[in-house]
Curated annotation (Swiss-Prot):
Localization per record: Secreted, Extracellular space
Similarity remark: Belongs to the peptidase S1 family.
UniProt remark on domains: The beta chain mediates most of the interactions with both subunits of hemoglobin, while the alpha chain forms the homodimeric interface.
Molecular function in Gene Ontology: antioxidant activity; hemoglobin binding
Disulfide bonds: C49-C81, C105-C139, C143-C260, C303-C334, C345-C375
Gene: HP
SMART domains tied to this protein: Tryp_SPc
Keywords tagged on the record: Acute phase, Antibiotic, Antimicrobial, Antioxidant, Disulfide bond, Glycoprotein, Hemoglobin-binding, Immunity, Repeat, Secreted, Serine protease homolog, Signal, Sushi
Function: As a result of hemolysis, hemoglobin is found to accumulate in the kidney and is secreted in the urine. Haptoglobin captures, and combines with free plasma hemoglobin to allow hepatic recycling of heme iron and to prevent kidney damage. Haptoglobin also acts as an antioxidant, has antibacterial activity and plays a role in modulating many aspects of the acute phase response. Hemoglobin/haptoglobin complexes are rapidly cleared by the macrophage CD163 scavenger receptor expressed on the surface of liver Kupfer cells through an endocytic lysosomal degradation pathway.
Keyword RNA-binding: no
Classification lineage: Eukaryota, Metazoa, Chordata, Craniata, Vertebrata
Native source species: Cervus elaphus
PROSITE patterns according to UniProt: SUSHI, TRYPSIN_DOM
GO cellular component: blood microparticle
Protein name as catalogued: Haptoglobin
Amino acid sequence: MSALPVVVTLLLCGQLLAVEISSEATADSCPKAPEIANSHVEYSVRYQCDKYYKLRAGDGVYTFNNKQWINKDIGQQLPECEDASCPEPPKIENGYVEHSIRFQCKTYYKLRSAGDGVYTFNSKKQWINKNVGQQLPECEAVCGKPKHPVDQVQRIIGGSLDAKGSFPWQAKMVSHHNLISGATLINERWLLTTAKNLYLGHTSDKKAKDIAPTLRLYVGKNQPVEVEKVVLHPDRSKVDIGLIKLRQKVPVNEKVMPICLPSKDYVAVGRVGYVSGWGRNANFNFTEHLKYIMLPVADQDKCVEHYENSTVPENKTDKSPVGVQPILNKNTFCVGLSKYQEDTCYGDAGSAFVVHDQEDDTWYAAGILSFDKSCAVAEYGVYVKVTSILDWVRKTIADN
């Protein structure tokens, strides 16, 4: 007798599970039964469920007859094992029972869809959610919820600040000439940085597709991630911004978490935000540890006047910047020095100016540092306003 493969379908508390069972019955494995007068021999098998399961119907005994396995109760229908730990609920008058499950996301993730994650198994053997129907839920990364917010971190001597995990969205980018700059994680696979950062060590005619392979990128505690592509803003002469797409999603955890993109403007004059980075320190050396600084949003008109005067020799002051000038327009805002006269510096560009919204206890990226040449010499740092590029960011991510 040849081997008979059997497939048993399990119903686990209302959830169908297909389970393959390798069941064999062979004549060689059983000695031939002795013959008696006026009779015939039938071969039979008994299906038994695993521990904590029970047969749904029939006694599990199948007899081989005319090359078919037959059960006296359910015929050729194969048996099903059901979860014995889920007893049938009691019946109620004018009522019925529905089996339901709830999808839940892992720590640091949340449901993306409009539904509540509860699905009911209906008579058509479909899992249905009251809000989204048969559409399965998706889990997306939580953003702007650091485990150790910045206000819980102690300031250290010397004016520099130790982040200690307060800025899990901060990434470090290294060019092919080993020039360090910043980038900001905005979801599991995309980061914002400046167009100037992407062109570090490259000529202005370099194509974006040729820049991507030259970049080294690190998130969390120097965890390397691979760059798939870069996308530059179509008007990068006026909007110093670019997007980086990773080959794989980064797992979100305590050390790696995206910053939230704002739905409103957080750059009113006097508003305080924080900037982190690996830029040069007071000795003009790149720091080995992530530092941060608290800075106030400055008056835009005064900032523009400051930089315009710096190009006129007779108007220059000790605080006038030298060399390249920042991009200043409706897409930017300015930030002043800290109360300790501290500032961002070379290598900090691409980092986010983040603000804490106390209403929803969430951190948002209000700006991306574009002009990091001030280094406490000029009075103002210049940032790309994130609300001004939101449409482009969302479209770029959707199209890629």
